[in-house]
Design a protein with these regions (language model features):
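Sec-dependent signal peptide recognition
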Residues: 2-8
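Hydrophobic h-region of N-terminal signal peptides that target proteins for export
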Residues: 9-17
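Catalytic-domain carbohydrate-binding cleft regions of carbohydrate-active enzymes
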Residues: 187, 259-263, 281, 290-297, ...
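Surface-exposed extracellular loop regions of Gram-negative outer-membrane beta-barrel proteins
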Residues: 230-283, 370, 394-461, 521, ...
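Exposed, low-structure sequence patches enriched in small/polar residues
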Residues: 354-356, 362, 448-752
């Protein structure tokens, strides 16, 4: 039955294949030097083909854009050049700050989308605002953007009353591509976003139901003469760091201060990026440090399971789909945050684990094959005589074969080897000497992006027979202008173990069905509205229902891009063991009894305001039954844009849980004021505060960044953790310190 589904997916892919609306562009090599000054007056620009006639994508996907855009492309031995004339009144600019890598939908922008591999899945985005603020991102799985990726490129902008003019130079060394003897062509698209008119437009039309940056909808860039073969592409990225840390060690029972320690430390390390071939890259790292990476945003965890946090460290991002996208979101065989990060059992915080060295080879072998190899070694950490984390070696091998244009058949092997030597018997408890995963999967993506699907089978291996299991899943979805329907099935064996992956729950079968219908009314304010039904239902292997989340929803999107979702849900949870929904487990309260099912229902309202306005926000309000009690939850974010200086914001989360006596009741607050300032295009500052009563922690993270050269920075980072609330019968008060750290770090990017 399971094996028979793969040919069915292939068949559906073939019948879903549709021709794209063809757009073509020929690019010629420049015979003159291009001076990057925002004034495209060189002779190469006068003879280059002019691209116009951008098509609207939002709020409607018919008709031409209301503001004219003119694009020209040329190249020389080192760079791909783009010249753009974007007509727009200077007084109507929306540019929130001068900081690089601004989020999508927050600024007026011109985006260049490049897909040199022509797979419709993996590419590059380069964006520029009217004030010459840059952003770049990797694109994987057709639409997913990784703005954490940084690389070198240049741009210049001139502003006029009725238009802004940009010149962009992208080094060929920055891109990954191959040069063939015959036809040379890339897939490309260009996107323009203007917030004051709520309009998004593209050169190659993109249907409104899909993201505008979707690589399934691209035109073809033909090179009249082949692009240059990239020469030796080697970049060295050394760093040096100095830090001072204060720790406040307290008695775990009385919380009396036992010892206050302070220590200075310094270190050096770095990365190297080596282009093995124009489309295959080797990343090496020695003693890496990620102290400048933005801290995780804390959330109130009311569930029984581990929460997922995204990877932000740049070393793991390029070609990340080759490593991170296997499996479903709840069954990832490899999760890069298992490397170099671990929970300290004494403090409850995630802390850095020293990485000694590592390497990562990823990219295309040829037009049909991609490969990913990763090996990293971490250092042993001993917290005390009872708690330790063994040093570990992580190895990942992946291989992907392109099929039918945008689909792929892939295999993965993951190996984690724990070095248990040197640990005492207590410290060894719970660790295997090794754990391995082998898996195979097929991903379906039709040419017109209407059909998507996934099929996989993974198996785990460990010395302990009780940790040798499997997981399998199947997904098929169909999306067109009005109809969206999908069905997923996932099965996770009780013995399936992925120590280097993310598998928060075992021993379940999961069904995830959904169907929705979108309407496009001719209305002054409403752009679309959608009704739908979605389910997330878990069963044990003997078909006992363990969890159910059934939702009926109404989704409304306004023409100014404000969105609202009304949802009514019916939930069911079977507790196999006692559980405190507050996760506090405080004395004097009892957990809910296990071996019992709880049915409860409620409603939720979400609203996200338009980013057009300087004052904006989002809110989610949930109210209803919760196990045998009630829950009121309010969470969201409100921000003010002082353009182009910066943004001041406050995130908030409030959870009120009321269960009948003698069970728990609690109010949880999570407040996160933050400020992001851009003094120039090279000097930035940010401050982020997180007040979390559930974790009883108040975190401060402040960062000053000076970009003194392209992709080269000096960071000054201050981090402080203290108590958010007093603890009865102890010396702990609000703001009683836990630890403090100040770090000065310099990173330099050197092209060899």
């Amino acid at each position: 039955m399971r094996i028979a589904l793969l040919p069915l997916l292939l068949f559906l892919h073939l019948i879903a294949h549709a021709q794209q609306s063809e757009r073509m562009l020929h690019i010629q090599r420049s015979t003159t030097e291009i001076k990057l000054d925002g004034n495209p007056d060189e002779s190469a620009w006068q003879t280059a083909t002019v691209l116009t006639d951008f098509q609207r994508q939002f709020p409607v996907d018919t008709g031409l854009a209301t503001a004219r855009t003119e694009l020209r492309l040329t190249f020389d031995a080192q760079h791909l050049y783009i010249a753009a004339v974007c007509y727009q009144q200077r007084s109507s600019y929306t540019v929130p700050s001068l900081k690089r890598d601004f989020p999508s939908g927050t600024s007026d922008v011109l985006n260049i989308l490049l897909n040199p591999s022509k797979d419709g899945l993996n590419g590059f985005l380069f964006g520029i605002s009217p004030l010459n603020v840059q952003r770049e991102a990797l694109i994987d799985n057709g639409t997913t953007l990784s703005y954490e990726w940084d690389n070198r490129w240049e741009s210049a902008v001139q502003n006029f009353d009725d238009r802004w003019v940009a010149e962009i130079a992208i080094p060929f060394k920055t891109l990954r591509y191959t040069v063939s003897q015959g036809d040379n062509s890339w897939l490309v698209n260009f996107l323009r976003g203007r917030l004051n008119t709520w309009e998004v437009s593209t050169w190659r039309p993109v249907p409104q139901q899909f993201p505008a940056n979707n690589l399934a909808f691209t035109g073809t860039l033909y090179w009249d003469t082949p692009p240059p073969k990239p020469g030796v592409n080697i970049a060295l990225i050394p760093y040096s760091i100095g830090s001072y840390t204060q720790d406040y060690k307290r008695n775990p029972n009385s919380l009396e201060l036992e010892e206050k320690t302070g220590r200075w430390s310094g270190d050096i390390g770095g990365d190297a990026k080596i282009g093995i071939t124009p489309s295959l890259n080797l990343d090496l790292t020695f003693n890496p440090d990620f102290s400048q990476v933005e801290v995780d945003r804390q959330v109130a965890n009311l569930s029984r399971f581990e929460l997922f946090f995204p990877e932000r460290r740049q070393f793991f991002l390029e070609n990340r789909d080759l490593f991170a996208m296997f499996g479903f979101p709840g069954t990832r065989p490899f999760f890069s945050r298992r490397i170099g990060l671990a929970r300290n059992p004494l403090t409850g915080f995630n802390e850095s684990v020293p990485i000694l060295a590592g390497g990562r080879l990823s990219g295309k072998i040829n037009d049909d094959w991609r490969i990913g190899l990763l090996n990293m070694q971490t250092k042993r950490v001993e917290w005390d005589s009872m708690h330790a984390l063994p040093g570990a070696n992580f190895t990942v091998v992946t291989l992907q074969r392109k099929m039918f244009g945008r689909s792929a058949l892939s295999g993965i092997f993951v190996d984690k080897e724990n070095a248990l030597g040197g640990l005492n018997e207590t410290q060894r408890a719970g660790y295997n000497s090794w754990n391995r995963i082998a898996g195979l999967e097929y991903n379906l993506n039709s040419a017109d992006n209407r059909w998507t699907g996934e099929w996989y089978y993974h198996r785990s291996f460990s010395p302990d027979p009780g940790q040798r299991g499997y997981t399998l899943a199947q997904y098929l979805g169909y999306s067109e202008r009005h109809l969206n329907v999908f069905l997923a099935y996932m099965r996770v064996d009780s013995n399936y173990t992925a120590e280097a992956g993310f598998v928060p729950r075992n021993g379940i079968q999961n069904f995830y069905p959904g169907i929705g219908w979108t309407f496009y009314p001719k209305h002054r304010f409403i752009n679309t509205w959608r009704i739908g039904v979605e389910g997330d239902i878990n069963y044990s292997f003997d078909w006992q229902e363990t969890d159910r989340d059934l939702s009926f929803l109404l989704d409304i999107k306004l023409k100014d891009q404000t969105s609202m979702v009304f949802r009514v849900f019916n939930n069911y949870t079977f507790l196999f063991e006692d559980f405190d929904p507050t996760n506090l487990n405080e004395p004097g309260t009892l957990p809910l009894p296990g071996n019992k099912g709880y049915a409860y229902s409620g409603a939720r309202f979400d609203i996200v305001s338009s980013t057009t306005y300087n004052l904006q926000g989002e809110m989610a309000l949930t109210a209803g039954r919760y196990f045998n009690g009630r829950l009121l939850r309010m969470e969201g974010d409100i921000s003010y844009r002082w353009q182009p200086i910066g943004t001041f914001a406050m995130s908030y989360s409030f959870n009120r849980i009321r269960l009948p006596d003698p069970y728990a009741a609690a109010d949880f607050w999570l407040l996160g004021p933050r400020a992001e300032m851009s003094f120039t295009r090279k000097l930035f500052a940010s401050a982020f505060f997180q007040y979390n009563t559930q974790a009883n922690n108040f975190n401060i993270n402040a960062r000053l960044q000076w970009r003194f050269a392209p992709v080269s920075d000096v960071f000054l980072v201050y981090t402080d953790n203290s108590y958010a609330e007093p603890v009865p019968n102890s010396p702990v008060r609000f703001f009683t310190p836990k630890n403090k750290t100040i770090v000065l770090k310099m990173v330099y990017w050197l092209n060899v």
